[in-house]
Amino acid sequence: IYGRDYVSIFGAGTSNSEFEAMTGNTIKFFPRGSSVYQQFMHESTFALPGYLKKLGYRCEAIHPSSGANWNRTASYKSMGFDQFLTIDDFKNPEYVRYISDKESYKKVIERYKNKKEGQPLFVFDMTIQNHGGYLTNTNWKDPVYPEGSHLPEAKEFLSATKVSDDAFQYLVKYFEKQDEPTIICM
């Protein structure tokens, strides 16, 4: 199954895209420049985690950065997440610019392995490895050089994307070996 996800932001304001994905609502009707998590998420908000909890799911969020960023800790709670794992929950992680996508996916697998038997699990993992900007000083193991490009930022972006693709393959291969039906939505 595949489709398109149209987002209302570009280049900043990740939390607004998260809000739209988790609630099914648009930020179009909020004031221009709003940060929904910081300005409007004060009470319980109808969202996918709250709905899934009513169906018996345990709902967890992972973001390997500070929970204070964009007021995620409070916002995730208002959406119904049972637990929110932040940078503090990663012990000696691998870094690729930031905490690597593979480390974040290892945390997803850890949560799956440790879940209560028979209880369905929803994990929302907001990775951070490829967060902008695209400085050009990373020492890549296998750099990707765009043919004909003289922009070092392109090499940085594409090299980071390749490492992310490899990490995503690691996650998919793990769940392909599990008997329990699993949906990975990227």
Name each model-derived stretch.
Residues I1-M186:
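Solvent-exposed soluble domains appended to multi-pass membrane proteins
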